[in-house]
Swiss-Prot record:
Residues 1086-1122 are annotated as: Disordered. It holds the Pfam family PK_Tyr_Ser-Thr. Residues 516-1137 are cytoplasmic. Residues 840-871 form a coiled coil. It is found in: Membrane. Glycans are attached at residues 219, 348, 358, 384, 417, 451. It comes from Caenorhabditis elegans. Keywords: cGMP biosynthesis, Chemotaxis, Coiled coil, Glycoprotein, GTP-binding, Lyase, Membrane, Nucleotide-binding, Receptor, Signal, Transmembrane, Transmembrane helix. It is a single-pass type I membrane protein. The lineage of its organism: Eukaryota, Metazoa, Ecdysozoa, Nematoda, Chromadorea. Residues 898-1028 form the Guanylate cyclase domain. The gene is gcy-1. Belongs to the adenylyl cyclase class-4/guanylyl cyclase family. It catalyses: GTP = 3',5'-cyclic GMP + diphosphate. This is Receptor-type guanylate cyclase gcy-1. The chain crosses the membrane at residues 495-515.
Length: 1137
């Protein structure tokens, strides 16, 4: 009633208290004195909040602040009033602090009710209040009601939610609440808040079976309470204010036999001491907090209860604010000097309590008083001013309270509502009786539900080490009085047990019989399975009619006829490079290979059983193994097209990109399947073990045979497919990794892409051993096959993938699964099946074959005509026909022919004035037009050598005596043409000919097989050559025989004259003649010049060329000398200048 009267007066007449308040604004000065008003208590709860054992914390805190660099610009003055938590005294002291002493800050009374009153008073005068002691009531955290109050003690409501979380963590929901009586009613308030949190609908339901108050010196009441607790609960939450009461509780629960494995005593505290007490008697301390264990006596000696209290402490846990102090040495210093500090200046406490205080004990809340003063000093320093208008402004100052620091009560964090954000921890004792934190309950952002962190992994060993490593139950199995134990299983189910035993025995007998049957069946099944993979040697028949396909014709894709399944229907199959043998088994052709006889283990046999079950389109099916002969013989399905090595070695087939892609994809799919099976890898992959069936589908063979030794020593060439890490380590298949298969796959892919053997070994300068050595050697740039393909549309990504697969480091190679995944995007989605692709190719080939044949036939006919024309230009037609027919051309004699020789006069001089190209072009122009003139006459051009020109008439087609006329006419045309012929690069030079003609017998024939030539033999030819060499420029020189033929058979047609007798080399003296032209075509002056010549009469007969003659088939053109020599040039190759 007293407090309400005081508050009413304070609210009605506030002017009484503030009317004489002077202006606080003063001139700034160098150092400012801070006045601290302290409402202390000496006679209540002396060991906890007594000023004699706590007051020294204030000057020690100021001293520590200055050591840490704070409050250097301030001095402090203390005004202490012992209010003893009396409400009237609190109001009086508050008014004196504010009105009389004009304090800057008030350290409030250490009791919750008194602190509320002081806070109301200070709020009206804008003074900050620091709370400590028993001030954990929840309403004191209301920043709206108490905006200027701050404390380092968390409120008990937070403790309640932490306790609720703890019970949930250990699955307890039935508890007892016990608390010691005190005048300040601290524990009573705490338990009220605990009860409120347990009843909060947002928390798990907790059944409070008893809530009782116990007394330190009232053993009768306490005994009754403990007896009631024993009959109702095993999980006890209890609260006390002093260390004496803590030790008293331990001794009492030990006396009442409440320290068994069923009991859990959890002390609720917010004093940051856990299992410790604040004393300086020199007794052992905890390593974490630096405090003395509560089971130690409070005297320098012992009182005989230490062992009992220590044993009881093993059944106790403490839920307290984190008590770990960072600076334990200063805490020890504080414990030793706190009494001295309160007695010495500036406190100068001279009361009886201060002067007689026990120097070995520090007050329970002394550390909290230290921390709250330390907090004020930090906030004061952070105002960065000694101006009272600044630090005296409480609204500015309270914002600086929101901070954190390492204090004597652990890590202090002040929230925006000016209360401490606690870290509650559940403490227990380890095997060394040292307190350890077991569970952490952390509050963040003012949320009332803490976060739980467990500091242990094994709950039984860490938390319940003193409980037999088993968590106690909140309700004992036998009840609280031990009378509700369940009936033993034997007594309750004795009859049922006998019946069950009989049934079990009967079932065991049935099971034994069943097991025997199962074992027998499994043995029979195992024998049957073994019989499946064991192929009797007697059933393997070598086919006498087996025919290799070496002599058989093969199509472009190496197709071969199918193999009949009967004994009588044996046909050809492809060759095998490996030592395979084709045999008959169960009326089917199979592929076999021999191995040396070895001992087969149980694991080998089980593997063969599993191998028979392997089924994949790219795996060659394993039929079995013959083990009843001198050798082991493996039997697999026959692939009629042989192996990839066989196909590539023959090399007489075409393969486009999609065909290559499908072959490589089949190998990759086979590997992917094997790598996922029990075999794990192939281990012997090479192109010889990749077999191809009729459908051009690749199937991997020789897998799972690594424990068998081949009958013949394998060639070193097989090492070309082996990965470098296998070569270096000489690894067996069981030691290899699947990446070794990937390397072998890359070598096979390179064979397919290049359509050559591995490493192109046939065209490579290194032999197998050198290649294997270099691969084994490795290095920064290891040797690898070259991928050079003649297929233009090969996807570069496929080549890149192959190169990735033969990477030197096994880990860098892709897996078979990755290879298959990447290959899906390397070909058009419309193309998926190789046989469909082959059929499409055949259809396209069939549709275009007829057109191609017709076109080729036309081309062949045209080329044949061209060849015939060319051949007819080289040889006479009839001679060429006989040569084309494969007939021998016999030499043939002719009685009368005329031979023509010509030569360019002074050709050497002309050639010296020309470059070689110009010389060739000169002769080409001249002789091309000569050839045109020849075509108009019955003359055959034999050859032209340099500037020499040889022609003949009268062979190979006989023309009577017309040959002399043809030669003379042609010679006159030659002379006429030379008069109009101009040399482009020598316009002043003229071309003149010397012509020699002779008639007589001759022999002609084809000489030679390489570049055959139609040659003339006989003296007639030599004499004609002498006529040319002894002739004169621009004149036609005839022998007497030729002249006689001309004048006899063609009289009066040609104007000739005798040259007289001339000495001819090899002939002696000969009379020769000149031909000047034809009558009627010569100028009159020319006729007068030769009128005195004697000329035989001639006739007007003319020779008509035979259209069936050899030269008659050549293309001809009409020669007109008036048109110039350009008209007669042929379309022949002309060498450029």
């Amino acid at each position: 009633m007293q407090i309400f009267t005081i508050l009413l007066l304070f609210n009605i007449f506030p002017s009484i208290f503030v009317q004489n308040l002077p202006d606080t604004t003063v001139a700034p000065r160098t150092k400012r004195t801070i006045k601290i008003g302290i409402a202390a208590a000496q006679r209540i709860q002396t060991s906890s909040i007594g000023w004699s054992v706590c007051g020294g914390a204030v000057p020690l805190a100021i001293e520590r602040l200055k050591e840490m660099g704070f409050v250097k610009d301030f001095d402090f003055e203390y005004i202490v009033d012992y209010t003893e938590c009396d409400l009237g005294s609190v109001v009086r002291a508050g008014m004196e602090f504010i009105k009389t002493h004009k304090v800057d800050v008030i350290i409030g009374p250490p009791c919750a009710q008194a602190l509320r009153l002081m806070s109301f008073l200070a709020e009206n005068y804008k003074k900050p209040v620091l709370g400590w002691g028993f001030v954990s009531d929840t309403d004191l955290s209301d920043v709206i009601r108490f905006p200027h109050l701050t404390t380092v003690i968390p409120n008990s409501l937070m403790l309640g939610y932490a306790a609720s979380k703890m019970l949930t963590t250990f699955h307890w929901n039935r508890v007892a609440l016990l608390y010691y009586f005190s005048d300040v009613k601290y524990c009573s308030g705490v338990m009220n808040d605990i009860e409120a949190t347990f009843n909060d609908p947002s928390t798990p339901n907790v059944n409070i079976v008893i809530k009782a108050e116990i007394y330190l010196n009232d053993n009768e009441t306490t005994d009754n309470v403990f007896q009631t607790v024993k009959s109702r609960a095993r999980i006890i939450l209890w609260c006390t204010q002093t260390s004496v009461e803590k030790r008293d509780y331990l001794i009492k629960i030990a006396t009442h036999d409440m320290i068994g494995d069923e009991y859990v005593h959890i002390m609720l505290s917010m004093r940051n001491v856990a299992f410790g007490t604040q004393t300086s008697l020199g007794k052992p301390t905890f390593s974490q907090s630096g405090l003395t264990p509560i089971w130690e006596s409070f005297t320098e000696g012992t009182d005989g209860f230490e062992k009992m209290a220590k044993q009881a402490a093993t059944r106790m846990f403490v839920l307290d604010v984190n008590s770990e102090v960072a600076d334990k040495k200063y805490l020890e210093y504080m414990q030793k000097n706190i009494i001295k500090a309160v007695q010495s200046p500036p406190m100068n406490c001279s009361t009886v309590e201060c002067m007689t205080a026990n120097t070995t004990i520090m007050g329970g809340y002394a550390r909290h008083l230290f921390d709250v003063v330390y907090l004020y000093g930090i906030a004061l320093t952070h105002t960065n001013s000694t101006d009272p208008a600044v630090y005296g402004d409480v609204d500015v100052l309270v914002h600086q309270f929101v901070t954190s620091f390492q204090g004597m009560t652990g890590h202090v964090v002040i929230s925006p509502n000016l209360t401490r954000m606690p870290i509650f921890q559940l403490y227990g004792l380890n095997s060394d009786y040292d307190q350890v934190a077991l569970v952490d309950f952390t509050y963040t952002n003012s949320v009332m539900v803490p976060n739980v962190t467990l500091f242990y992994k094994d709950e039984g060993g860490a938390v319940w080490s003193y409980y037999g490593h088993s968590r106690p139950l909140d309700i004992p199995i036998c009840g609280f009085l031990g009378k509700s134990c369940p009936v033993s299983f034997w007594e309750q189910y004795k009859i049922l047990i006998f019946v069950a035993i009989a049934v079990i025995v009967l079932m065991v007998l049935i099971m034994i019989i069943g097991c025997l049957c199962v074992i027998s069946g499994k043995r029979a099944e195992r024998a049957r399975i073994n019989a499946e993979w064991q192929v009797p040697f007697a059933k393997l028949i070598e086919s006498e009619k087996q025919v290799r396909g070496k002599g058989a014709s093969r199509r472009s894709l190496q197709s071969a006829p199918s193999i009949s399944t009967g004994h009588s229907g044996v046909t050809t199959v492809s060759d095998f490079c490996e030592n395979y043998t084709m045999m008959m088994y169960e009326k089917e052709m199979v592929l076999t290979a021999k191995y040396q006889y070895t001992h087969l283990t149980k694991a080998d046999k089980e593997r063969f059983v599993k191998m028979r079950k392997l089924d994949h389109e790219n795996i060659n099916r394993f039929i079995g193994l013959s083990i009843d002969s001198a050798h082991f013989i493996s039997v697999t399905k026959l692939c009629s097209r042989g192996s990839l090595q066989d196909i590539l070695s023959r090399g007489n087939f075409s393969m486009d990109y999609f065909f290559m892609f499908c072959i490589i994809r089949d190998v990759a799919k086979g590997l992917e399947y094997l790598h996922k099976t029990f075999l794990r890898l192939h281990g012997n992959l090479r192109s010889a073990t990749c077999l191809v069936n009729d459908s051009w589908q690749v199937k991997l063979a020789e897998y799972g045979m690594d424990n068998l030794v081949e009958e013949q020593t394998p060639p070193k060439k097989r090492l070309l497919w082996v990965a470098p890490e296998v070569l270096r380590g000489s690894l067996s298949v069981s030691q290899m990794e699947p990446s070794a298969d990937i390397y072998s796959f890359a070598i096979i892919a390179s064979e397919i892409l290049t359509k050559k053997e591995a490493w192109d070994i046939l065209d490579r300068k290194e032999d197998c051993e050198e290649i294997v050595y270099n691969v084994k050697k490795g290095g920064l740039f290891p040797i690898r096959p070259e991928i050079i393909t003649d297929i233009h549309d090969v996807n570069p990504a496929l080549i890149a993938l192959v190169k990735d697969c033969w990477a030197e480091v096994p880990e860098d190679r892709p897996t078979a699964e990755n290879i298959c995944s990447q290959m899906k995007g390397l070909v058009s989605k419309q193309k998926t099946n190789l046989m469909d692709h082959v059929f499409n190719m055949l259809e396209e080939y069939t549709s275009t074959l007829e057109e191609e044949i017709e076109e080729r036939t036309k081309e062949l006919t045209l080329e044949k005509k061209k060849a015939d024309i060319l051949l007819s230009r080289m040889l006479p037609k009839q001679v060429a026909e006989r040569l084309k027919a494969g007939q021998t051309v016999e030499p043939e004699g002719f009685d009368s022919v005329t031979v023509f020789f010509s030569d360019v006069v002074k050709f050497t001089i002309l050639a010296s004035k020309c470059s070689p190209f110009q010389t060739v072009n000169l002769l080409n122009d001249l002789y091309s037009n000569f050839d045109t003139i020849i075509e108009q006459h019955g003359v055959y051009k034999v050859e032209s050598i340099g500037d020499g020109y040889l022609c003949v008439s009268g062979l190979p087609t006989r023309n009577g005596y017309a040959h002399i006329k043809q030669i003379v006419d042609m010679s006159l045309k030659f002379m006429e043409y030379c008069k109009s012929f101009n040399i482009p690069h020598l316009p002043r030079e003229n071309v003149e000919l010397r012509i020699g003609v002779n008639s007589g017998p001759c022999v002609a024939g084809v000489v030679g097989l390489s570049m055959p030539r139609y040659c003339l033999f006989g003296d007639t030819v030599n004499t004609a050559s002498r006529m040319e060499s002894n002739g004169k420029p621009s004149l036609i020189h005839l022998t007497n025989d030729a002249h006689s033929l001309l004048t006899t058979h063609y009289p009066n047609q040609y104007e000739t004259s005798s040259r007289g007798e001339v000495i001819i080399k090899g002939k002696g003296v000969m009379e020769t003649f000149w031909v000047h032209g034809r009558f009627g075509e010569m100028e009159p002056t020319e006729l007068r010049s030769i009128s005195n010549r004697s000329t035989p009469p001639v006739t007007n007969d003319r020779w008509i060329p035979n259209p069936s003659s050899s030269h008659g088939s050549r293309p001809s053109s009409v020669y007109d000398p008036l048109q110039g020599h350009q008209k007669f040039k042929m379309d022949t190759l002309k060498v450029a200048n």
